[in-house]
Amino acid sequence: MKIKNKSLSDKSRKWLKRHVEDEYVKKSSKENYRSRAAYKLMEILQKYSALKNSRVIMDLGSAPGSWCEVLNRNIHTEKYILAVDLLKMKPIKGVEFINCDFNDDQFIEFANQKKPFDLILSDISPNLSGYKNADHLRSREILENTLDIALKYLENGGHFVSKYFRTGDISDILSTCKKNFDKVSSFKPTSSRKESSEIYLICLNKKNIDS
């Protein structure tokens, strides 16, 4: 496919061409998902089937909503889904959405009302600059913040899944995860672009370390 818009830079033109020709972009359109990211969560749920037993779920960085759609289609029993994003998200049946930052009082109020959660998900991506050190710090900060939320609001036995980027050392964060969860691993779905450094941290069965 040729991209003829002359106002686009070569870089933008290449990105657009790759996007419209992407297998998962086409598939998401055909299967009525809001974005290709849906297939990443499908693969995660398939590999880590215990996640499908979740009933009270938090989706951080939820917009445009494809992960909520996957949860609705793959978890068939009664459930509650709280979706959180700074970006607006069109309504999804069965999903409660709050348009705020997870440091806002509105989020804290909702989370405290609905806790404990048995699954907390994050597909948040930082605004990458192309500078490795800066991008690592941004990615690391997001991972630290989402892990803090998981440790605060997950029930014992609950699970945490978060995107991060392999741009630097996070061994201290992994140590915290291993201290607080029975099983900790990393997983890169086949639907994640090969050239992307993104990968997902999978933390299963939060420990009752206070007992």
How should each PLM-predicted stretch be described?
Residues F102, K115-G157, V161, R166-S171:
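Mobile active-site "lid"/loop adjacent to the S-adenosyl-L-methionine
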Residues V84-S129:
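S-adenosyl-L-methionine
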Residues R55, K79, G158:
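Glycine-centered, small-residue-biased loops immediately flanking beta-strands
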Residues D10, R166-S211:
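Class I S-adenosyl-L-methionine
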